[in-house]
Amino acid sequence: MSVIKMTDLDLAGKRVLIREDLNVPVKDGKVTSDARIRASLPTIEHAMKAGAKVMLMSHLGRPEEGVFSEEDSLKPVAEHLSGLLGKEVRLVRDYLDGVDVADGEVVLLENVRFNKGEKKNEEGLSRKYAALCDVYVMDAFGTAHRAQASTHGAGQYAPVACAGPLLAAELEALGKALDNPKRPLVAIVGGSKVSTKLTVLESLSKVVDQLIVGGGIANTFIAAQGHPVGKSLYEADLVDEAKRLMAAAKAKGGDIPVPTDVVTGKEFSESTPASTKRVSEVAADDMIFDVGPDTAASYADMLRKAGTIVWNGPVGVFEFDQFAAGTKALGEAIADSDGFSIAGGGDTLAAIDKYGLASRISYISTGGGAFLEFLEGKKLPAVAMLEERAKG
C-alpha cells in the first residue's frame, strides 16, 4: 500500500498536526498505563527535532460530544508527556481558530471529542482541523478503522496528509503477515463468541494453513464435532457455521484443529478446582475453561514450526492460574518460534504482559478493533484516505 511517510518529509518550520492514540487509563488525575503514550514518542520526537511546530490531537474516554468535562480532559496526558519528553507540553483548550506554536515546541490539543461533529466526520470541523497545519500526520492505528474528523476528514483537507512511523510500522507488519506470508501461516483466534469473530474466522480460514481456535469459540467447534460441552459457553446456533468453516478449510488444504483434551471446572471462579479430561468425557455440569496439555503440546508444535503467526485472543481463562497453562504454552511457543509473529487485541496483550513475552514477539499491534478489521480483510478508512492523498 502506498502512502506518504512523515519520515520522508521536510518538516522544518512547518505546522505539523499529529493524530495520535493517547486514549490511556487515568485515575485520580494521573495516567495509570502509558504504553500508548510511549509508543507515540518516536513520532513526536522526530517532528520536534526536525524543527516543526508540533500539535498533537487525540480522544480520551467517551465524553458527551461537544461538552467539556474535567474527567475526560487530556490534562493528565499533557503532564505525563511533559515528563517523558523532558520539556513542557502545553494543553490548548480553544484551538479551532488557530494555535501559536514555536518551532520545536510541542502542544497537545484538548480532547477531540469535545468538538461537535468529531464522530460524524463533519466537513466543517474537518476543514478547521486541516487549516491548523501544513502537514497532517495520521499515527493512530487504533482508531484507523473509524472515519472521524480527526482521523479521516482532517487528512482529506490538509495541504499534505501522511502516515506517522507508528502507523507505517503497523501497516508494514500486518502486510508482512497477511499479504505475502512465509508459510506455514498459523493464526490463533480466541475469544468468547464465534458471532463476534465470525468474519475474522471466515477471512483467515481462506489464507492460513492452520487456524487455532480458543476460548468460548473453541467450544462451538467442539460441539460441531459432536462432543459434549456441558454447561460451557458456546453458541448452538453457530454449530453449522463451525462445521462449514472446518470443511471449507479442509477443502483448500488447511485445517481448523479442534482440542482433543480440555481443562474443566464446575463454576467460573478463581477457586474452582480444575480437572483435565478427554474432550469426549466432558460431563453435563462441566464448563470448559482451557485446552488440555496434549492439545497445548500439539498446537505449540505447530507454532514452533510456523513461518508466520497471527495471534488474536487467549485460548483459556488465563486470568485464573488453574486455567492458564494453555495460553502460557502457546505464548511461549510463539516467542520461541523463528517465524514472524504479530499479536493484537487487549486480552492478548494482557497475556503477553503476564508471561513477559513482549521482547520475543516480532510485532505487537496497538489496535484492538482496527487490528481485527484488518484481519477481516476490510479497508481501514484512514488508510484508504492516506492512499488516496498519496496519489495526489
Curated annotation (Swiss-Prot):
Keywords: ATP-binding, Cytoplasm, Glycolysis, Kinase, Nucleotide-binding, Transferase
Residues binding ATP, per UniProt: K197, E319, G345, G346, D347, T348
Enzyme class (EC, first level): transferase
Main subcellular location: cytoplasm
High-level lineage: Bacteria, Pseudomonadati, Pseudomonadota, Gammaproteobacteria, Chromatiales
Pfam families: PGK (PF00162)
GO molecular function annotations of the record: ADP binding; ATP binding; phosphoglycerate kinase activity
InterPro entries: Phosphoglycerate_kinase, Phosphoglycerate_kinase_CS, Phosphoglycerate_kinase_N, Phosphoglycerate_kinase_sf
Domain of life, source organism: Bacteria
Pathway: Carbohydrate degradation; glycolysis; pyruvate from D-glyceraldehyde 3-phosphate: step 2/5
Name of the protein in its database record: Phosphoglycerate kinase
E.C. designation(s): 2.7.2.3
Gene Ontology terms: cellular component: cytosol
GO biological process: gluconeogenesis; glycolytic process
Gene3D superfamilies: Phosphoglycerate kinase, N-terminal domain
Family label: Belongs to the phosphoglycerate kinase family.
Quaternary state and interactors: Monomer.
